[in-house]
Amino acid sequence: MNISYDDLGFFHRLGADGIRLDLGFDGRKEALLTFNPYHLAIELNMSNDVAYLENILTHQANTSFLYGCHNFYPQEGTALPYHFFQSSSERFKKNGIRTAAFITSQSGTIGPWDINDGLPTLEMHRHLSVETAAKHLFATNLIDDIIIGNAYASEEELKSLGHLDRYQTVFRIEFVANVNEVERQIVLEEQHVRRGDITDQVIRSTEVRKKYQKDENKVHDTEFEFVVGDVVVGNDRFGKYKNELQIVLEPHSDPRKNKVGHITPEELILLPFIHPWSKFKFIEK
């Protein structure tokens, strides 16, 4: 094709916005590419946890045109584990490089290879809904852009991504039959903030109890052990803690708390990303 890294005019004439370097060169060449006169973005492969990026940056790359994107993995069992994804992504984020990763449509059947078991970056996402996988990537604060790897995503999948709040986690909750109107309001209509002095047992949203301190909350759904992902609200037995909302992180029992619902099981992977002072909300499944 007679193409050289010294002249990217071929890609410009194609109408491309950028090029991906899956393997790369020696660092100096990549840095020079970021100064191409066509302002084409130069995208690096993020799925290698080595000092490749640092080498490019030592050659004074133009980081305004330098991007990072992970690979996708069509074969079941071959995508990245989370700890490796985290380490390799942090290399880019700490240097202010824009990042991207892939999620997989559960309805798409078309990919670039003859094997297509989905096209995620993370193996843990392979059988998750696009909504939950995207929530997880945004919750890590490591990924700026999300790409659906396979075609074609369903209208429902696209709509769910279109309504996604990328700036805070919104949990889907299934309510128990006995949930009352005050509890529904506390769960669905309030902005929740995890208390800053955290505990291992629960995620506490304490400000809501002040707003609802005068509202009655009769006892219900207290006679069993709460499990991880249960959402509980303090009942009339709980004194000053009445109507405080909590998400259960460790199994325990407490008759002063009503179970009002449970976070959708596949979204339990989001709980570790609710840090001190993190904001979060709920929607009904």
Predicted segments with their positions:
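Short low-complexity stretches enriched in small and charged residues
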Residues: 24-27, 55-59, 100-104, 197-205
